[in-house]
């Protein structure tokens, strides 16, 4: 009888050892975060690049399988813009900011809940029956009040745009308790502002910022982490100096920096600050253009992006 000998290339064995080393490096982080809740705000280039979309779904499924409870909160600006253009609906701007008219709000609602959310649920569920889509309207999950903005010292009405002032996490917890992954679109019923987020609804639905919505959800769930995917490497002390990337800062340090930040980073960093102030242990800005960036941040010693931590942790 003739036996065929099979040999392994030295390089393949080296690659295998590297992979084993990566798994061992991840072990203490898997042990630390198993059983905890992580809220991830999904947005930016990760939403429109097919490879990044698939990688994001893989990351969420990986988190689920190592015992973490991921909750995904998403916007959908590029998809909304595309649909408005296809339908011939002209966008109105005031002070450089989009005004959400009733006609535009119908599109926002349709795209976020009926397109972006469904596509993301489908990507995750290509790996198994894990994800369940939700809207901020479902079960009174989110409550919002209408907000405008100030441009050149004057109040500007942005239409059906709101800020989340209340979260009822019961529906999310039910899905998590069932072993599923909630995927939440950021539209919310409007309520009359009574100062504590529990006023009566008006019957109107508002478009809310996904960063601040994710922070509110993280706070309501008592999440261990809030992760916001964006299109930059993190927070820079002196933008655009790439060497000034900040790896970690305290809530007080961020509070001092906030008024001086670039306008595009303000809502994201304000969301991180809100989450930390309301008891979330860590808030992170992570580059969503990098495949598997969430896993690199969570399960490697070096981490990536910028993390915000409570003052007490540094002073302890």
UniProtKB/Swiss-Prot annotation:
Compartments where located: Cytoplasm
Enzyme Commission no: 2.7.2.8
Pathway(s) per entry: Amino-acid biosynthesis; L-arginine biosynthesis; N(2)-acetyl-L-ornithine from L-glutamate: step 2/4
Swiss-Prot/TrEMBL site (Transition state stabilizer) positions: 41, 268
Chain residues that bind substrate: 76-77, 98, 207
Family under the similarity heading: Belongs to the acetylglutamate kinase family. ArgB subfamily.
GO MF annotation, one: acetylglutamate kinase activity
Organism: Paenarthrobacter aurescens (strain TC1)
Main location: cytoplasm
GO biological process: arginine biosynthetic process via ornithine; L-arginine biosynthetic process
Nucleotide-binding recorded as keyword: yes
Keyword list, A-Z: Amino-acid biosynthesis, Arginine biosynthesis, ATP-binding, Cytoplasm, Kinase, Nucleotide-binding, Transferase
Purpose: Catalyzes the ATP-dependent phosphorylation of N-acetyl-L-glutamate.
GO cellular component terms attached to this protein's record: cytoplasm
The protein's name in its UniProt record: Acetylglutamate kinase
Catalytic reaction list: N-acetyl-L-glutamate + ATP = N-acetyl-L-glutamyl 5-phosphate + ADP
Database matches in InterPro entries: AceGlu_kinase-like_sf, AcgluKinase_fam, ArgB, Asp/Glu/Uridylate_kinase, Glu/AcGlu_kinase, NAGK-C
Domain of life of the organism encoding this protein: Bacteria
One Pfam match: AA_kinase
